[in-house]
Amino acid sequence: MSTVKPLKTKNTDYINILVLCLCVTAVFFVAWTFTGQWPWKSQPYNSYILQAQSWLEGRLDLGRDYPYLELAIFNNKYYVSFPQFPSYAMLPFVLIGWNSCDSMIAFAVSLLGAVYAFKILKHFDIESKTAIFFTLLLTVGSNWLMTAQNAWVWFIAQNMAFTLSLMAIYYALKNKIGLSLAFWACAVGCRPFQILYLPALLYLIYNAHKAVNPEDKIIDIIKKRYLTLVPMAVIALSYMILNFARFGHITEFGHNYLPEFTRSELGQFNIGYMAENLKNMFSVPETQNGIWQYPYANGMCIFLVSPIFISYLVYIARSIIKHEKFDMKFMILVLTIAIIELLSITVHKTMGGAHFGNRYTNDVLPIIFIGTVMLLPKDNDWESFNYPLFFIGLAINLVGSIMFFVQ
C-alpha cells in the first residue's frame, strides 16, 4: 500500500467511531468492576497533578518528599522525575480546582487514541468493520490495555504518548505538517524515545506533500512551510527551559536524579542490562504444575501481550512472498525505528518496573501499527489469522492487568 495518496474529504463515520468507543469502554468496564479503577476515582500516584499544583503556586519543585512516588532529588529539593507534558495537559483543570482530573483525562486520551487509529485505517479506505477490528487489535488486544486503565504516573504518560504518536502519524498522512510535528513534540514530552518517530513522520509528510505538489523539491517544501514548525519549536523550547531551570541542563528532566539510579553501580542506562532485558522481552513465563507463572515486573514475551507484532511480521512475509507492490523504503524505516527503540529500552535498568506485560514496548505500537496498515491487502485476505491473535491478546492482558491491580 503506497504512502502517496491525494487528499480528499470524507464524512466522518460517527456511528462506527461510537461503536469503537463503546467496545473499548466495555473492556475497561469489565476491568474496572474488578479493580475499582474508575475514571472518576482520585489516584494516589498523581505526580503530574502535584507538579501542576506546584507550578500554579510559583514553585518548580514539589516542596516536600512523597516517599511513595518516584521523585528526583536535586540540590535537596524534590521534583517529578518524568517528562513534563502530562502536567501541561492537567494545568487548566487544576487551575479551576479539579485536582483529580488525571483519571478522566486518561480515559479520554485512551478513547482518543482508538479514534485516531481508526481514522488512520479509514485514510487508506479500509472497510469500517475491518478498521474497527484492527483498532481493537492495536488497543484492547495488546499490552496498551495495561497502561490505559488508569492514571498512575507510570502509565498515563505512556497512554498519552501512544495517542499523540497516532495523531502525529494521522496528520502526517493528511499533509498537516504543523499539527503532525506539534503532536510529535507532545509525545516526546511524555516518552522521550518517541523522538525516533521523526524520520517516519517526515517521510509521510514528504509523500503527502508531493501527492498534491509533485514538482516541489525538499527545499521548496521548506520555503513554503517552514512557519508550520513554530508550534513544535515552542513546545520543545518549553521543555528545554523547564529542564534548565530545574536541573541546569536542557535535556535533563530528572530521571537521572532518582535515588534508584544514583545509587546504582551501572546507573539508569547501561549496555550491561541488555542481555537480561532482551531475554525477558522474548521469554514466555515459566510453568509450575502446568500453570504459567506470569511475572509482574520487568517484562515478558511481547508476542504474547501485543500480538500485533506477529501480525506485522506476517504481513511483511506475505507481501514479499506474493511479490506485491508496497513501499519497501517505509517498511525498512518502520523496522529500523522499531528495532532501535526496542534495543534502546533494553539498556534501561528496570524495563518498566512493576506492571503486567511489557509496557515499555508499548511505545513502539503506533509505528508498528502504521507499518501494518500500509501492508493490509485491499481484498481482506489473511485477515482471519488475526482473530485468534486478538483474543489471546485481549484475554491475557485483561486477566493479567486485573490481577496486577487487585494484588
Where are these regions (language model features)?
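Membrane-proximal envelope and lipid/glycan-remodeling enzymes
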Residues: 1-407
